[in-house]
Amino acid sequence: MRLWSSYSSIDLEEVAGSSLVLQPIGSIEQHGPHLPLVTDSLIAQEVALQAIRETPTASILLPIISYGLSSEHLHASGTISLSPTTLLAVLDDLGASLARAGVEKLVFLNGHGGNSALLRVASRELRVRYGLMTFLVHPHLPVDQVSVVSNDREGGFAIHGGVAETSMMLYLKPDLVHIDRLERSIPDWLRRYSKIGFGGPVTFGWTAADLSSNGVIGDPTSASPEAGKRSFEAGVSGVVAALEEIQAFQFPQY
């Protein structure tokens, strides 16, 4: 296993410049009454570990950043959120350190949708400030799992604690899933709007409390470890394929 923290300093010098460096990032936040706070971080970490095992591409895995931008879930006990300013500062310091070590390509493996917009900003800034080639991969977001774990009852509103995440957790860590607490929670009232939505031409600011009484935005009731296995393997395969393409990617010289 190629773990950044397992290298000695002098050994790392020899491989940093030629290796992709993977930084998984997740969250510690509520996922409804049935899933643990660590859900996003655990899935991102497991996908990253398996992708490192399977990829032929020279790559090194950094320790996961477990805290993310989770302000939309702060109403719920247990959620820990960094502010956008703090998380950007952490990522900037990370980029500066990696650039000093000779790293050329950094890949963020994001396990939490709330991090996405900020990670896009950070990716641009790290390119501008330190010359790092930065990439953002979403290994398991529900939107990427629709063809693998489908549930008509979710109707396009499966963004948090639904069948996809619950199935993944039943496969990876079933002892942390409270099967007796599975409950469908869908903001059906959003269907009356044709333009406003999660993936439509008009997006909106929201908290989980605006959309759900129990923190779930989805329908986990049909979740299964078998579906979770399919979803996990699809996520890993997607990351491995992305890493191979990222390794070959270069900007042209003008």
Where do the protein language model's features map onto the residues?
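Extended, histidine- and acidic-residue-enriched regions that form the cofactor-binding/catalytic faces
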Residues: 1-107, 113-254
